[in-house]
Amino acid sequence: MAKGIREKIRLNSSAGTGHFYTTTKNKRTMPEKMEIKKFDPVVRQHVIYKEGKIK
């Protein structure tokens, strides 16, 4: 079976709550680090989530 291009990433909250989302991204079309504004349920606000490594 062929190995896919998409790689799992972890989106960490910039609010410092420890909350994170996991998603996948295509490394070939998006080589830079991902930043998305998403909802953080701990602080109950939309904050910026930055890409980090899955441990």
UniProtKB/Swiss-Prot annotation:
GO terms under biological process: translation
InterPro entries: Ribosomal_bL33, Ribosomal_bL33_CS, Ribosomal_bL33_sf, Ribosomal_zn-bd
Keywords attached to this entry: Ribonucleoprotein, Ribosomal protein
GO cellular component terms, semicolon-separated: cytosolic large ribosomal subunit
GO molecular function: structural constituent of ribosome
Record SUPFAM superfamilies: Zn-binding ribosomal proteins
PROSITE patterns assigned: RIBOSOMAL_L33
Lineage: superkingdom: Bacteria
Keyword Signal: no
Family: Belongs to the bacterial ribosomal protein bL33 family.
Record-linked PANTHER family: 54S RIBOSOMAL PROTEIN L39, MITOCHONDRIAL, LARGE RIBOSOMAL SUBUNIT PROTEIN BL33M
NCBIfam families reported in the protein's UniProt record: PRK00595.1, rpmG_bact
Protein name per UniProt: Large ribosomal subunit protein bL33
Source organism of the structure: Aeromonas hydrophila subsp. hydrophila (strain ATCC 7966 / DSM 30187 / BCRC 13018 / CCUG 14551 / JCM 1027 / KCTC 2358 / NCIMB 9240 / NCTC 8049)
